[in-house]
A protein has these predicted regions:
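Conserved class I S-adenosyl-L-methionine
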Residues: 1-57, 70, 156-186
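Class I SAM-dependent methyltransferase SAM/SAH-binding core
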Residues: 60-115
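A short acidic, Gly/Pro-enriched loop at the edge of an enzyme's catalytic core
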Residues: 118-127
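Residues lining the SAM
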Residues: 129-131, 160
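A short glycine-rich, Lys/Arg-flanked "PGG" loop and its adjoining helix->strand segment in the class I
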Residues: 141-156
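Short alpha-helix
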Residues: 190-213
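Core SAM-dependent methyltransferase catalytic element
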Residues: 206-208, 229-255
């Protein structure tokens, strides 16, 4: 277990300085998030957050596996007291530097999302995990037990990630995709491709009560680059993968 975590940490320390992550930290990109914070979220997810939170001002929010920190910056702009955490110290250093440069008052903490060990019980009103987190988690029940632990009574957990229905397919756009694995094969080649029931059961076991689930096919948000911006990407007759939801969002509350 410790070896697995150390491997992930080493990979992310290197990846934090990759060309792709640098592209997520340009002044233009950061300015767009600060000026339009809702753009850091899929539109339906932001609507769910607004509805379920009833506003963000003064709310204590944890963003584990914060990565590029866009969601964390956005929530801070909206008035939340935000803590961003990540297993990568480099990611947190980059996040802190950008927040300081733009006058954002936020906390940045190095932490394993499965453990959330720096945080005490009942600290946060919201814990939000963004796209890509769950594929790095080898024990979702452990992650959600700790999310429930750090949430205040009545606090909300919201996850948004690639829909598990996408995982069995090769995923090429505009061609008939191949089936490359079984839906039940949750750990192919080191990735953790959890099923819908794995996510729901982990939340239920932790004592979280699911309030709402979204299954989204907002192709324009998922396929953000190049030819995939074309309107035809949303037509399943031309792009077969568009017949399936691209993302899933689940809101669950601590009783």
């Amino acid at each position: 277990m410790l070896e697995y975590i150390n491997e992930i940490k080493a990979w992310w320390e290197e990846t934090a300085d990759s060309e792709w992550y640098q592209s997520r930290r340009t002044e233009e990109m950061i300015r767009s998030v600060l000026e339009k914070p809702e753009s850091a979220f899929a539109p339906q997810v932001f609507g769910l957050l607004e509805k379920r939170m009833g506003g963000f001002a003064g709310k204590k929010v944890l963003v584990p596996s914060a990565g590029d920190c866009h969601a964390a910056y956005a929530l801070a702009v909206l008035g939340a007291e935000v803590t961003a955490s990540d297993i990568s110290i480099r990611q947190m250093m980059h996040g802190w530097r950008i927040a300081e440069a733009h006058g954002l008052e936020m906390d940045f903490v190095q932490a394993d999302t499965m453990q959330l060990e720096p945080f005490g019980g009942e600290e946060f009103d919201l814990v939000y995990t963004s796209n890509g987190v769950h594929s790095w988690i080898d024990k979702p029940e452990k992650m959600y037990a700790n999310i429930a632990r750090v949430l205040k009574s009545g606090g909300l957990s919201v996850m948004w990630d690639i829909h598990p229905f996408q995982r069995p397919f090769s995923g090429e756009r505009f061609v008939q995709p191949e089936i490359i694995k079984a839906y039940d094969d949750v750990s192919p080649q080191g990735d953790n491709h959890w099923r819908v029931m794995d996510l729901v059961n982990a939340m239920a076991k932790s004592g979280l009560c699911i309030e709402e689930m979204l299954e989204m096919s907002d192709i324009s948000y998922f396929y953000a680059f190049g030819e995939e911006k074309e309107a035809r990407a949303a037509d399943w007759r031309q792009n077969p993968m568009a017949a399936l939801p691209t993302h899933i969002c689940i809101a669950a509350r601590k009783g």
